[in-house]
Amino acid sequence: MKPEDFRASATRPFTGEEYLASLRDDREIYIYGDRVKDVTSHPAFRNAAASMARLYDALHDPQSKEKLCWETDTGNGGYTHKFFRYARSADELRQQRDAIAEWSRLTYGWMGRTPDYKAAFGSALGANPGFYGRFEDNAKTWYKRIQEACLYLNHAIVNPPIDRDKPVDQVKDVFISVDEEVDGGIVVSGAKVVATNSALTHYNFVGQGSAQLLGDNTDFALMFIAPMNTPGMKLICRPSYELVAGIAGSPFDYPLSSRFDENDAILVMDKVFIPWENVLIYRDFERCKQWFPQGGFGRLFPMQGCTRLAVKLDFITGALYKALQCTGSLEFRGVQAQVGEVVAWRNLFWSLTDAMYGNASEWHGGAFLPSAEALQAYRVLAPQAYPEIKKTIEQVVASGLIYLPSGVRDLHNPQLDKYLSTYCRGSGGMGHRERIKILKLLWDAIGSEFGGRHELYEINYAGSQDEIRMQALRQAIGSGAMKGMLGMVEQCMGDYDENGWTVPHLHNPDDINVLDRIRQ
């Protein structure tokens, strides 16, 4: 049974309930040494799953459906999330940006690998299926399937960080490669990372990152899609922040960790059968190398990522402001200046999303893609911005972030609460419970293990720091922008030579130059 078969109607996306039901498919998820029987009820995953289900319910809610959805283009007469159907104009890209933002606000920007993230991949399949050569029909089929149901895909495209100085074909015992061709498909084995939130997805796309050395062995030159319950495919998860928050605290203590933890995992494939209809690239080095720059995903996912980050910075900026209201620090000029810098970062990323659709360009199949210049700026600047914002919060909120009781149970102890009401009260008449609630929220955002993981996530979201800068340079050269910049400099240098100005509208200083008079 396919995940989309859990829907009561084939003309609409999953509801939240149908989405949760589709995850109960005997997938192999392991955490703390045990196999998870049901990710929708296991305390390591259940609130994250419920948060994801809420996104699906929003697609059907009359209050949000119009903002989030439009008609499919597959001929099924249904509707879908706007980012699951490729845009045919700059204005449609704007509508997609707004739909991404609307969905992201339901998690306050804290879940990055929501279904619309990989919708960037699905949309590109429909706009440019010819990129996949002999697997073009597979691309068309997957575009239709992903769009009509709003299937939840994730990807695992990074090889485990082992012998990174060697081409992949020299680490054959670790990296995913073809074992053999069999009747109806291929058998593959190996591992990929970091399969973020894959425990809660329907399918995983397995491919190659943009900066990996592929070597000469075509066994590694492949890309495919696999259902999460494929026999032989396993996820080995990192510790669950949701579970730890439940064991050692409460929603009051860990309001973000408790519900928005996207568990990262090692994806292991042990002789997994992949039918030909799920293969997109096979033994083709050139297509693997060109997939990121030419396949479309590399131009679409940054709009989802930048919009999601902008929503997240709305939240972080608001939480910072409230925290400073707690401490009474907002009246200080220096603090106001630092908060203003955080606001400027927030404004920058919203402005980049405007530029992405505002300077869009037409691509294959009548599709419009976001501005390459704007998305490259986002990919380079976001990893710089997030640590700077975190540092600012640590500086201006300072000890307020840890000047807190251990947990909500301290508030329930009358002997302790009477002290907390005095020594942990907020400024300007704010009660101690409100102050503690605000500062615990901000600590969970930046200081808890959940918060630390988010900093790592944002720093490495787009990949290697060197590579994203080199891609920005290559884009400037390839687009002709660098030629224009050089031309401006050359034009300036052409305005003068060693004898003075070469343009007729300027005056040489022969009549006033003192050095010439002295020399005479």
Swiss-Prot record:
Keyword annotations: Aromatic hydrocarbons catabolism, FAD, Flavoprotein, Monooxygenase, Oxidoreductase
Pathway this chain belongs to: Aromatic compound metabolism; 4-hydroxyphenylacetate degradation; pyruvate and succinate semialdehyde from 4-hydroxyphenylacetate: step 1/7
Biotechnology annotation for this entry: HpaBC can provide a biocatalytic synthetic approach to the production of hydroxycinnamic acids that is an alternative to, or complementary to, conventional methods such as chemical synthesis and extraction from plant sources.
GO BP terms: phenylacetate catabolic process
GO molecular function terms noted in the UniProt entry: 4-hydroxyphenylacetate 3-monooxygenase activity; flavin adenine dinucleotide binding; oxidoreductase activity, acting on the CH-CH group of donors; protein homodimerization activity
Transmembrane region(s): none
Entry superkingdom: Bacteria
Enzyme Commission number: 1.14.14.9
Residues where FAD binds: 155-157, 196
Catalytic reactions on record: 4-hydroxyphenylacetate + FADH2 + O2 = 3,4-dihydroxyphenylacetate + FAD + H2O + H(+)
Known partners and oligomeric status: Homodimer. HPA 3-hydroxylase consists of a reductase component HpaC and an oxygenase component HpaB. Some form of interactions between the reductase and the oxygenase facilitate the transfer of FADH(-) to the oxygenase in P.aeruginosa, although interactions are not required in other species.
Known role: Oxygenase component of the 4-hydroxyphenylacetate (HPA) 3-hydroxylase. Catalyzes the hydroxylation of 4-hydroxyphenylacetate to form 3,4-dihydroxyphenylacetate, using FADH(-) provided by the reductase component HpaC to activate oxygen. To a lesser extent, can also use reduced FMN. In vitro, has hydroxylation activity toward tyrosol and various cinnamic acid derivatives, catalyzing the hydroxylation of p-coumaric acid, caffeic acid, ferulic acid, and coniferaldehyde.
Family: Belongs to the FADH(2)-utilizing monooxygenase family.
Protein name (database record): 4-hydroxyphenylacetate 3-monooxygenase oxygenase component
Organism field: Pseudomonas aeruginosa (strain ATCC 15692 / DSM 22644 / CIP 104116 / JCM 14847 / LMG 12228 / 1C / PRS 101 / PAO1)
